[in-house]
């Protein structure tokens, strides 16, 4: 769980920005979006395989440069 401590002289906007960065770093929103609807195991496997292939292609492109 993301948490921050707000100083007495810190603006709310600055604290909110820090909180949003912490939430993004923890991956809370992406996890919530992923769990919003049930995902069948076959769909989950396909999604993971597609992500793995994208990662391999990206690594291959970077290795060629």
UniProtKB/Swiss-Prot annotation:
Gene3D superfamilies: Ribosomal protein S8. It comes from the Bacteria. Pfam families: Ribosomal_S21. Residues 43-58 have a biased composition (Basic residues). Residues 33-42 have a biased composition (Basic and acidic residues). GO terms for biological process: translation. InterPro entries: Ribosomal_bS21, Ribosomal_bS21_sf. GO terms for cellular component: ribonucleoprotein complex; ribosome. One of its GO terms (molecular function) is structural constituent of ribosome. Residues 33-65 are annotated as: Disordered. Keywords: Ribonucleoprotein, Ribosomal protein. The keyword Ribosomal protein applies. Belongs to the bacterial ribosomal protein bS21 family. This is Small ribosomal subunit protein bS21. The gene is rpsU.
């Amino acid at each position: 769980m993301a948490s921050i401590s707000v100083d007495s002289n810190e603006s709310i906007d600055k604290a909110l920005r820090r909180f949003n960065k912490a939430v993004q770093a923890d991956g809370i929103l992406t996890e919530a979006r992923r769990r919003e609807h049930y995902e069948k195991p076959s769909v989950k496997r396909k999604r993971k395989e597609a992500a793995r292939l994208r990662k391999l292609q990206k690594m291959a492109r970077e290795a060629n440069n």
